[in-house]
Design a protein with these regions (language model features):
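Conserved catalytic core of two-metal-ion nucleotidyltransferases
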Residues: 1
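Conserved nucleotidyltransferase catalytic core and NTase-mimicking acidic/glycine-rich helix/loop elements
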Residues: 26-175
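A short, charged helix-loop
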Residues: 4-35
C-alpha cells in the first residue's frame, strides 16, 4: 500500500491501524557509481541525437529527444545534487517540482532555460544550457559523493555538438 495512505472513514471499524503517512519512500536515493555513470553515459550519448535532428531540420524529433531522453537524465542529476545538499532526506517532487528549494542559487533558473519552443536557435540554446548545467551538477555531485566523472565522454559529446551546430546544410561528413 502507499505510504501516504490515511483512513478517511471507517464506519464499521474493520480496517487495521495504519502507520502515520510518510514520504520517505519517495526520497531521492543516493546513486552508486554504476547509477551515476549510467546517467552520465545516457545523457552524453543521447544529446548528440538532438544535434543531428536540428542539423537535419527535424525540430520535432530534436525536441522529442531532448525532452524524452535527455531531460530525465538531467533531472536525475539535479535530484542527486539536491540529495547531496539535504542528506538524501527529501523528495524531488513530481517532475522535480520541489527541487528549487534544495538546489544551489540560480540552478533552477538554469534548468528552466533548457525548455525551448520549436525555433531551432532556441533549441540549440537549450541544448547547450542542458549540457553545461548537467556537467556542473555532475561535478558537484561527484565531488560530494566521491565518484568519478568520465571527462572524456563529456568532452567528446560537447565537441560533437559544437561541430554539428556549425555544419553547413549540405555537409557530407562531420569531421
Amino acid at each position: 500500500s502507499d505510504s501516504q495512505t490515511i483512513v478517511l472513514l471507517d464506519k464499521d471499524g474493520i480496517l487495521p491501524p495504519l502507520p502515520l503517512p510518510s514520504d520517505t519512500a519517495y526520497h531521492i536515493r543516493r546513486p552508486d557509481q554504476t547509477a551515476f555513470a549510467g546517467c552520465c553515459n545516457e545523457f552524453w550519448w543521447t544529446l548528440p541525437y538532438v544535434a543531428k535532428g536540428l542539423w537535419r531540420g527535424r525540430v520535432t524529433y530534436a525536441l522529442d529527444t531532448l525532452n524524452a531522453c535527455v531531460r530525465p537524465q538531467l533531472l536525475h542529476m539535479l535530484s542527486w545534487l539536491a540529495g547531496t545538499r539535504t542528506g538524501f532526506a527529501v523528495s524531488a517532487g513530481k517532475s522535480g517540482a520541489d527541487l528549487p528549494a534544495y538546489l544551489p542559487a540560480g540552478c533552477w533558473e538554469r534548468y528552466l532555460s533548457t525548455y525551448a519552443d520549436a525555433e531551432p536557435g532556441h533549441v540549440w540554446a537549450a541544448v547547450f544550457a542542458a549540457a553545461t548545467l548537467f556537467l556542473d551538477a555532475a561535478h558537484q555531485t561527484a565531488e560530494a559523493l566521491a565518484l568519478p566523472v568520465n571527462e572524456a565522454e563529456a568532452e567528446g559529446s560537447l565537441r560533437y555538438l559544437y561541430r554539428v551546430r556549425e555544419l553547413p546544410a549540405d555537409a557530407s561528413e562531420i569531421f
